[in-house]
Amino acid sequence: RFIIGGLLGFVLALTALQATLGFFAASPLRVIGGSEPEQEFLSSRLGQHAVAMQALDRLPEDSRIRFLWEPRSYYCPTGLTCEPDSLLDRWWHERRLGAGPGELVAGWGQQGVTHVLYYRLGAEAVRSAGFDPLNDDDWKELERFLTEDLVVAETFGDAYVLYRLP
């Protein structure tokens, strides 16, 4: 019992130390104290995601942005509707419903979608992981959809592309 209790205490102490070091490494107190601007803090922690979310703020109010391979929408600007791809399956789901790229543009437009935020690195991660339901035809149709059916509005590094529906 003594040994198990000692080991448990040691593990808890290491966990507390790791959490404390992580807290101070993230430096949230600088933002809370006002010595670091919030957007600068977010950019340093979230990278291109923060830049893309900030750029959405320039879109017209009431814009509806549908995300592909991006599950995070917490920093979506007020006045906009962001639809995250929570299960990273939006493209797969639409393809299984039989919608072709042209039909998607029309259908999404009828639903009020004005823009598509494509997380290129997220799609590449899913593809390289060999996500079974998506086959080569699905990926080819996605590429065609992005290049022929949508209009590039803005690019954020190699991570994100914001498209608008024509």
Locate the predicted segments by residue.
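Short secondary-structure junctions
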Residues: 147-155
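Extracytoplasmic
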Residues: 29, 34, 56-59, 66-108, ...
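Active-site beta-strand termini and strand-to-loop segments that position acidic
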Residues: 164-166
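Short hydrophobic/aromatic beta-strand or adjacent loop that forms the aromatic wall/cage
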Residues: 157-162
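Membrane-interface segments at or immediately adjacent to transmembrane helices
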Residues: 22-64
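Conserved residues at the C-terminal ends of beta-strands
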Residues: 68, 114, 119
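Signature aromatic-anchored transmembrane alpha helix within multi-pass, membrane-resident enzymes
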Residues: 1-31
